[in-house]
UniProtKB/Swiss-Prot annotation:
NCBIfam families documented for this protein: PRK00230.1 (NF001273), pyrF (TIGR01740)
Reaction(s) catalysed by this chain's protein: orotidine 5'-phosphate + H(+) = UMP + CO2
GO CC field: cytosol
Biological function: Catalyzes the decarboxylation of orotidine 5'-monophosphate (OMP) to uridine 5'-monophosphate (UMP).
Lineage: Bacteria, Pseudomonadati, Pseudomonadota, Gammaproteobacteria, Enterobacterales
Gene Ontology biological process terms, A to Z: 'de novo' pyrimidine nucleobase biosynthetic process; 'de novo' UMP biosynthetic process
Name the UniProt record assigns to this protein: Orotidine 5'-phosphate decarboxylase
Subunit structure as annotated in this protein's UniProt entry: Homodimer.
Pathway in which this enzyme or protein is active: Pyrimidine metabolism; UMP biosynthesis via de novo pathway; UMP from orotate: step 2/2
Residue sites binding substrate per the record: 17, 39, 66-75, 125, 187, 196, 216-217
Similarity section: Belongs to the OMP decarboxylase family. Type 1 subfamily.
Organism encoding this protein: Buchnera aphidicola subsp. Baizongia pistaciae (strain Bp)
Keywords: Decarboxylase, Lyase, Pyrimidine biosynthesis
EC number: 4.1.1.23
Length: 236
């Protein structure tokens, strides 16, 4: 049975990382596509491909294809056009791929009337300052993320994907009126952060005024997923 809501805009994206398609569909059939969008990442896309995406679209769900594209500009151009041909709602691309790659991604969407939202990945929520230092990045995490956000804005991406803790700093330096912010790593108080080092609660996400939040394991691994979703929605 679908959940009822007065929400006009989808602002919750549920991350599907199932290895079993039947288990995924059992979970999905309880969701209302007018409330929730679905995120398909590397696991499910590799296992079930475009066929699975089309099944979800027929059910009315908007799809965020989270493959975090990162390649040379020419390859990205073709990949993003392929995504657009699938009527995908949102797609992710690594900002660190560079200005030319990002411009190529934007140019690839020019012929399309219904363009997917092009969202730039800043850094993975599993990384912290120590990890970045080992990669040779010596400036602070906040400065690095802000630098990437500015590049994404300059290249006319539709928005960025970043930790909630960085949003206030980004909003001080970038006009985010038409620039979407998506925050992953959402956890309820008391829940394990698993492998994510930069997590945000639903209440904080509301305070940060983000446009979209990604909910994953705290729901899909819950003994009562619908009750957990209702709790999250009550906090935003």
């Amino acid at each position: 049975m679908h959940l009822k809501s007065n929400f006009k805009n989808i602002n919750i994206i549920i991350a599907l990382d199932f290895f079993d398609e039947n288990k995924a569909m059992k979970f999905i059939y309880n969701l209302n596509p007018t409330i929730y969008a679905l995120k398909i990442g590397n696991i499910m896309f590799t296992l079930f491909g475009v066929r699975f995406i089309k099944i979800l679209q027929k059910l009315g769900f908007k799809i965020f294809l989270d493959l975090k594209f990162y390649d040379i500009p020419n390859t990205i151009f073709g990949a993003i056009q392929a995504v657009a041909n699938l009527n995908i709602w949102m797609v992710s691309i690594h900002i660190s791929g560079g200005i030319q790659m990002l411009k190529s991604a934007r140019l690839a969407l020019k012929p399309f009337k219904n363009k997917p939202l092009l969202m730039g990945v800043t850094i993975l929520t599993s990384l912290d300052k120590t990890d970045m230092s080992k990669l040779g990045i010596q400036i602070s995490l906040s400065k690095y993320i802000l630098s990437l956000a500015k590049i994404a804005h300059k290249c006319n991406l539709d928005g960025i994907i970043c930790s909630g803790t960085e949003i206030s700093n980004i909003k001080k330096h970038i006009n985010v009126k038409n620039f979407k912010i998506l925050t992953p790593g959402i956890r309820l108080n008391g829940c394990s952060s698993n492998d994510q080092k930069n997590v945000t609660t639903p209440m904080l996400a509301k305070q940060y005024n983000v446009d979209y939040i990604i909910i994953g394991r705290i729901v899909t691994s819950s003994q009562n997923p619908l009750k957990t979703l209702e709790l999250i929605r009550s906090q935003i």
